[in-house]
Amino acid sequence: MSELIDKYGTNLKDIYGEDIAKTNQIDGFVYGVPNQIERGSIPAIFMRKDLVEKYNINTDEIKEPKDMEKVFETVQAGEPDMTMLFSSNNSDTPLSRLSRADGLGDANTGALMDQTNSTTVENYFASDWYKETATMLHDWYQKGYISKDAGTNTENWRTVCKAGNLFSLFFAYHPGTPVEFQSSTGYEFEIVPFYDQPIINSSSYGGIIFSVAQNSENPEKAMQVLDYIYGSPEVMNLLNWGEEGTDYVVEDEENGIINYPDGVTADNAGYSFNCGWELPNQFIAYKWDGSDP
C-alpha cells in the first residue's frame, strides 16, 4: 500500500507522518495501516458495581488476579446461577486478557515476556507466568467460576452481561472503558487495574489494521475512501454511534459529548456500535456522556 499511501493518504500521513510505512510491513511491503486509538492499556478486573456493593467487596484487597478467588466465592454463594468470570472459545479468554507479553505477531513462535527489561524471545507456553496463570484459571473452571461451556461459547461478553448473567471479566483498562462498558451494557463497573503503568506492544499498532484487498477492482478509490474515513468525524460518528437524533443526541457540542435520546437506553437502542477502538480513528468522533472531554 506504500504507493497508494504516498499518493492518496493525506489524512494518514497527517496522523502518522512517514512512520506510517514502518508499521505492518514486510521487507518494505506495507500490507495495512493501524487504527488511531489509545496505544497503552493495563490488564484489569471489571466487576459489576451493584454486586460489589451488594456483597460488600473490599476492592482495596484486590492486588493481583489470584485475589479474585475470594471475591468469586462470596458472589457465587449469593448468585449461584451467574457466571463469575467471562471466557469464550476464541481469543477472548481470561488468560489472553491478563497477558502482558508481546507476542510479536504470533506468540506461538515466541514472545517477549518482560518487554520493558529484556529483548529475549522466550517460549510463551513454557514460561512460569503461563503455567501459573493457566493453573489458576483451570482451578477456577473446576470450581464453577468460569462457565462450563466456555470452550464452545461464541457469545460476546456484552450480550451475556446485558442479560444479567455475568459478574466480571478481565479486560484492558484505558480511560474510555468505564463509559464504554456502561453505555453498552447498562451496568456500572468497579475496575481494579493490576499494574501502575500501561503497556504498548507490537499488537498496539498491528492488532487492528485496515487494508486494500489484493483483488480490489479499484484500489485507488478504495484507498481514497479509507483515507477519507480517517479524517471524517461525520463518518466515524455514523459508524460508531448511528444516526444523530435517533440513536444519540449531542449534549455538549464544544466538548463533543453525546448521550441517548429520551426514551432510549442500552437495551432498546436501534444502533450503538460503541467500539470506536475497532474503527479507523476514534479520536475525531464524539465521546459518550461521562467521558473526560
What is the predicted role of each segment?
Residues 1-293:
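Extracytoplasmic/secretory soluble proteins
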